[in-house]
Curated annotation (Swiss-Prot):
Reactions performed catalytically: a myo-inositol phosphate + H2O = myo-inositol + phosphate
Record: residues binding Mg(2+) 1: E83, D104, I106
Protein name, UniProt field: Inositol-1-monophosphatase
EC number: 3.1.3.25
InterPro entries listed in its UniProt record: Inositol_monoP_metal-BS, Inositol_monophosphatase-like, Inositol_monophosphatase_CS
Species this chain originates from: Mycobacterium leprae (strain TN)
Length: 291
């Protein structure tokens, strides 16, 4: 069966279905591959990617393969960009109105390896390099966050479907701020120095370990704001849309060129967005962080 409709709501339904199925697969495969013990998993199931601290597991690659197989059945004419399997070099250069699916089979792989229950499957549909639908499925909790352009965001869990709205906070000093760190040692040091300057101007800071979940937490009002440098498109393609459709102010990197040009992502409740950007600007936090 194929689903040819490019309507955002139809694409959202596909994203939800794919993310939900993939999350169930990840849940089962973790127990099969790593057992039920918590703590870091080792052996041949884990290897390093960009740095020794940047892991990828056999479950990442298997899950992306599952997602690609399902999309080949449902959307055979669409392009696919996956964290593990690659895809179009420039998402803005695909033919007009072509749908590109942006996949992160496990966002939060370090958490996954250590048995920390903050990792998710992220599936987004983009047209001309802009997300129009997306879903983020929390593997352990079973929640599925989703959005479609212009149609709002919601979360589905054991209690049903709830509309997502970001927080109403209007004072940066009372904001709970999320952030994350790159894998490069040099970049991490610079990010830590920036965070040390940001910490006194907000209520407190959380580091969840999954950009997709950070953005969904902004959408749900569980974080008031989030910023992170060097975020890849597959990390934020679905979550940023979900946050924006929940009312957050979202700033994304300009991606005019080859994929891999990661950049700064900011999402904040509208009442503190300007103040957050001003604080980041004051500490030179809007500039790229390079090796």
């Amino acid at each position: 069966m194929t689903v040819p409709d490019n309507d955002p709501e139809q694409l959202r339904c596909v994203a939800e279905s794919l993310a939900t199925e993939a999350a169930a697969f990840v849940r089962c495969r973790r127990a099969e591959v790593f057992g039920t013990d918590l703590g870091a998993a080792g052996g041949g199931a884990v290897r390093a990617k960009s740095t020794p601290t940047d892991p990828v597991t056999v479950v990442d690659t298997e899950t992306e393969r599952l997602l690609r197989d399902r999309l080949a059945q449902l959307r055979p004419g669409d392009s696919i960009l996956g964290e593990e399997g690659g895809g179009p070099a420039d998402l803005t250069a695909t033919p007009a109105d072509t749908v590109t699916w942006v996949l992160d089979p496990i966002d939060g792989t370090v958490n996954f390896v250590y048995g920390i229950p903050a990792y998710a499957v992220s599936v987004a549909a983009q047209v001309d390099g802009v997300s129009v639908a997306g879903a983020v499925a929390e593997v352990v909790a079973g929640r599925v966050h989703s959005a479609a352009s212009g149609l709002g965001a919601h979360v589905t869990d054991e209690y049903g479907v709830q509309v997502l709205r970001c927080s109403a906070v209007d004072d940066l000093s009372m904001a709970l701020l999320g952030t994350g760190f790159a894998y490069s040692v040099v970049r991490r040091a610079a990010q830590a120095a920036l965070l040390a300057q940001m910490l006194p101007v907000v209520r407190d800071v959380r580091r969840i370990g999954s950009a997709a979940l950070d953005l969904c937490m902004v959408a749900a009002g569980q974080l008031d704001a989030y910023y992170e440098h060097e975020v890849q498109v597959w990390d934020c393609a679905a979550g940023a849309l979900i946050a924006a459709e929940a009312g957050a102010c979202v700033q994304l990197p300009k991606r005019n060129g080859p994929v891999g040009g990661a950049g700064l992502v900011v999402a904040a409740a509208p009442g503190i967005a300007d103040a957050l950007l001003a604080a980041l600007q004051r500490f030179n936090g809007l500039a790229p962080i390079l090796d």
